[in-house]
Amino acid sequence: MSFSVEVLAGIAIELQRGIGHQDRFQRLITTLRQVLACDASALLRYESRQFIPLAIDGLAQDVLGRRFTLEGHPRLEAIARAGDVVRFPADSDLPDPYDGLIPGQESLKVHACVGLPLFAGQNLIGALTLDAMTPEQFEVFSDEELRLVAALAAGALSNALLIEQLESQNILPGSSGVFEPIKETHMIGLSPAMTQLKKEIEIVAGSDLNVLIGGETGTGKELVAKAIHQGSPRAVNPLVYLNCAALPESVAESELFGHVKGAFTGAISNRSGKFEMADNGTLFLDEIGELSLALQAKLLRVLQYGDIQRVGDDRSLRVDVRVLAATNRDLREEVLAGRFRADLFHRLSVFPLFVPPLRERGDDVVLLAGYFCEQCRLRLGLSRVVLSTGARRHLLNYGWPGNVRELEHAIHRAVVLARATRAGDEVILEAQHFALSEDVLPAPPAESFLALPTCRNLRESTENFQREMIRQALAQNNHNWAASARALETDVANLHRLAKRLGLKD
């Protein structure tokens, strides 16, 4: 069998039929799999010495979330270096990146593999990979025929990336206009909620507006901030991060605005604050809702007038900083409760974004699981880490109250458990490797901590009672001090001070 003119014309037509790049890519690889009668096909994008799957057919869904580094995958490195069609023999010693990732064939290894590097001019922009369980599957197709397929795919991918680059304003007035791949931000997800979020990020990134990023703990608000910064004209300048929840009130002002020598005990030299560090760049204020009202007023002044004062200094400094703020609180409710300034809220929320919880992202769970599996594989030096069908189903059926962060920890824990029970450097994750159901959480103690303390005096009893309340709040909030302070209805700085006095922290 070989390609006829009709077959090639059919592939070209399929590339024009799709609505949007993703649909065209999917049509391309689905058609190729049918024409070549192979078990799996994939279109990959090349970026920063790694291949990123754009569309797959015949492979496990979590492949779309994986990032295949050249260092970790010698076959893909060979494809990247070759510059032409690469055929791997069935007895090749090089491991196939898709071993264990063909549904129903998790325990079997791929036999036949062909790689087609894709170029835009002299630049490598991606690859097509074709895999089959039958060793001689691709022998009937000549290299010339496969080069024609690669040329069609390269044209489609090159056009798509160039359009994406223009839409994201990565080619700005005065730039050379030379094609450059867009940087990966690890915002993995194809669900409608994530697709909408990515569109909103593209819209606001090129502006200089302040952005308020809302969402539950663990959803990836910091990644959103990085994506906004990378897509902005300020990307060549620093993105400075500050977690407001981890700031004791006594040093918060100094952290934000800096201080001069002698401003307070311990100020032995002048020190720049985060605003100065972020000058001409971006400042990301995580957990903005934890700032005291006094600091909120000073932050508002910076946003209004663009000048700061170091602690202990009468002079003002001009700064040009874009502020991105994140919170897991409902700041509208905080404003109504008097805990957050209404004027600051309106200054920050010029363009609000909401990061959806993982439970609302559908099959994105599997894509993210694939990404974390690949990270674990590289970190632990394993040849492969794959999810069984049962494990994928198990992950999809769980509610993920801790969102993406909980999924990451669950995958890492499962890999360690599976590795301990299986010899060799190959890990297949099964449902039993994940302890996700609520019934596996430790049961609360039979005796309530509200029981009457058996101490000799009122002060000792009160302190023991306070210690137990703080311990319980920390345990119930994953040792997050800000969340624990909210649960106890106290200020986080006061909670830190009380914990120190009670001997609960250094």
UniProtKB/Swiss-Prot annotation:
One matching Pfam family = Sigma54_activat
User: One biological-process term from Gene Ontology?
Assistant: phosphorelay signal transduction system
- To which pathway does this protein belong? Nitrogen metabolism; nitric oxide reduction
The PTM 4-aspartylphosphate maps to: D57
Keyword annotations from UniProtKB, A to Z: ATP-binding, DNA-binding, Nucleotide-binding, Phosphoprotein, Transcription, Transcription regulation
- What positions does the entry give for ATP binding? 215-222, 278-287
Query: Which SMART domains did the record assign?
Result: AAA, GAF
Residue ranges flagged as DNA-binding region: 481-500
List the signal peptide residues. Answer: none
MF GO annotations = ATP binding; ATP hydrolysis activity; DNA binding; DNA-binding transcription factor activity
Sigma-54 factor interaction domain span: 187-416
Membrane spanning residue stretches: none
Q: What does this protein do?
A: Required for the expression of anaerobic nitric oxide (NO) reductase, acts as a transcriptional activator for at least the norVW operon. Activation also requires sigma-54.
| NCBIfam families named in the record | PRK05022.1
Name of protein: Anaerobic nitric oxide reductase transcription regulator NorR
Gene designation: norR
